[in-house]
C-alpha cells in the first residue's frame, strides 16, 4: 500500500510497521554469536565454525532488514516528519547508551591506573608491559579520524546545497579514511607487545580500543550504504535521515577516540 492510498484510511502520521521476521532473527543471531564466541574462546568448541555461521546469519538478516527499511523510507513514503523525529530521538538514545558504555570502560581504566596494585609493580603501565607509543600509529589514526569528520561535514553541506558531485566525493573520501583507520588499528594490534590476556592493562586497553574498532567497522558499513543510496538518488537535500544519523555517529566516535587517545595512549603511558 502506497503512502497516498494509506492516507485515505490512516488519520495519523506514524508508521504502522508490518510484521517482519528480521528483528527476532537478528536477536537470535546475536545471541548465537555471543555464545559461540565465548564457548570457543574457553575451549568448549574446538573450531570457529559456529562463530562463522552465526556471523553469516547476522550479516544476511541485517542486510535484508535494512533493505526493507530502505524500501519503506524511499519507495513507500512511510518515513513522515513524525517518523523521522522518532528515528532521530531513538538514535540519540542509542548514542547516549554508547557514551555510557565507554564511560564505564574509562572508569575501569582510571580505577586501575590511578592506584596500581602491588601485583602490577605499583606502577602503570604494569611491569613487563611495553605500551604503544602515542606518537606512532595512534597519532596518525587521530589525524585520519579528525580528517574524516571534516570530509563528512563537507559532504553533508554539499548535499544540503544540492551539489551532488561534491557530496558524493566527500562521502567517498570519508569512507576510505575510515577504512585506512581500521587498517592502521589492525596493524597496531598485530604488532603490539601485549595481548588482551596480559593482566588488567591488556584487558581494559583492548576492551576500550577494541570496542571503538568494532564501531568503526560498523561506521564504514554505514558510510558505504549511504554512498550507494546517494548514488541511486535515494537521498535528497531535505530528506536524508539515515545520512544524518551516520554523520552524528561519525562525530561521536571522533570525540570518543580523542578521549581514548589522551587517556589510553598519552596519559596512561
From Swiss-Prot:
Keywords: Membrane, Mitochondrion, Mitochondrion inner membrane, Translocase, Transmembrane, Transmembrane helix. Its EC number is 7.1.1.9. It is found in: Mitochondrion inner membrane. Residues 42-48, 115-137, 189-201, 266-269 are mitochondrial intermembrane. It catalyses: 4 Fe(II)-[cytochrome c] + O2 + 8 H(+)(in) = 4 Fe(III)-[cytochrome c] + 2 H2O + 4 H(+)(out). GO terms for biological process: aerobic respiration; cellular respiration; mitochondrial electron transport, cytochrome c to oxygen. The N-terminus is blocked. It is an enzyme of class 7 (translocase). Residues 1-22, 74-80, 162-164, 231-248 are mitochondrial matrix. It comes from the Eukaryota. Changing residue 263 to T: In strain: D273-10B/A48. The chain crosses the membrane at residues 23-41, 49-73, 81-114, 138-161, 165-188, 202-230, 249-265. It is a multi-pass membrane protein. GO terms for cellular component: mitochondrial inner membrane; mitochondrial membrane; mitochondrion; respiratory chain complex IV. GO terms for molecular function: cytochrome-c oxidase activity; ubiquinone binding. Component of the cytochrome c oxidase (complex IV, CIV), a multisubunit enzyme composed of 12 subunits. The complex is composed of a catalytic core of 3 subunits COX1, COX2 and COX3, encoded in the mitochondrial DNA, and 9 supernumerary subunits COX4, COX5A (or COX5B), COX6, COX7, COX8, COX9, COX12, COX13 and COX26, which are encoded in the nuclear genome. Component of the cytochrome c oxidase, the last enzyme in the mitochondrial electron transport chain which drives oxidative phosphorylation. The respiratory chain contains 3 multisubunit complexes succinate dehydrogenase (complex II, CII), ubiquinol-cytochrome c oxidoreductase (cytochrome b-c1 complex, complex III, CIII) and cytochrome c oxidase (complex IV, CIV), that cooperate to transfer electrons derived from NADH and succinate to molecular oxygen, creating an electrochemical gradient over the inner membrane that drives transmembrane transport and the ATP synthase. Belongs to the cytochrome c oxidase subunit 3 family. This is Cytochrome c oxidase subunit 3.
Amino acid at each position: 500500500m502506497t503512502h497516498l492510498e494509506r492516507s485515505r484510511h490512516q488519520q495519523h502520521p506514524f508508521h504502522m510497521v508490518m510484521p517482519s521476521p528480521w528483528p527476532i532473527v537478528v536477536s537470535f543471531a546475536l545471541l548465537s554469536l555471543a555464545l559461540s564466541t565465548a564457548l570457543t574462546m574457553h575451549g568448549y568448541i574446538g573450531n570457529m565454525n559456529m562463530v562463522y555461521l552465526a556471523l553469516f546469519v547476522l550479516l544476511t538478516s541485517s542486510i535484508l532488514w535494512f533493505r526493507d527499511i530502505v524500501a519503506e523510507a524511499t519507495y513507500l513514503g512511510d518515513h513522515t516528519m513524525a517518523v523521522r523525529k522518532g528515528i532521530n530521538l531513538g538514535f540519540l538514545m542509542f548514542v547516549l547508551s554508547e557514551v555510557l558504555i565507554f564511560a564505564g570502560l574509562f572508569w575501569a581504566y582510571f580505577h586501575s591506573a590511578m592506584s596500581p596494585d602491588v601485583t602490577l609493580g605499583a606502577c602503570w603501565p604494569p611491569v613487563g608491559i611495553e605500551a604503544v607509543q602515542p606518537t606512532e600509529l595512534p597519532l596518525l589514526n587521530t589525524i585520519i579520524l579528525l580528517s574524516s569528520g571534516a570530509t563528512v561535514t563537507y559532504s553533508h553541506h554539499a548535499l544540503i546545497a544540492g551539489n551532488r558531485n561534491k557530496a558524493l566525493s566527500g562521502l567517498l573520501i570519508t569512507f576510505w579514511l575510515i577504512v585506512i583507520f581500521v587498517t592502521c588499528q589492525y596493524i597496531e594490534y598485530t604488532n603490539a607487545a601485549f595481548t588482551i590476556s596480559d593482566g588488567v592493562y591488556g584487558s581494559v586497553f583492548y576492551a576500550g580500543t577494541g570496542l571503538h574498532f568494532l564501531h568503526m567497522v560498523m561506521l564504514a558499513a554505514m558510510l558505504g550504504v549511504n554512498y550507494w543510496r546517494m548514488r541511486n538518488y535515494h537521498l535528497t537535500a531535505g530528506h536524508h535521515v539515515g545520512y544524518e544519523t551516520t554523520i552524528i555517529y561519525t562525530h561521536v566516535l571522533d570525540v570518543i577516540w580523542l578521549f581514548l587517545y589522551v587517556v589510553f595512549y598519552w596519559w596512561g603511558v
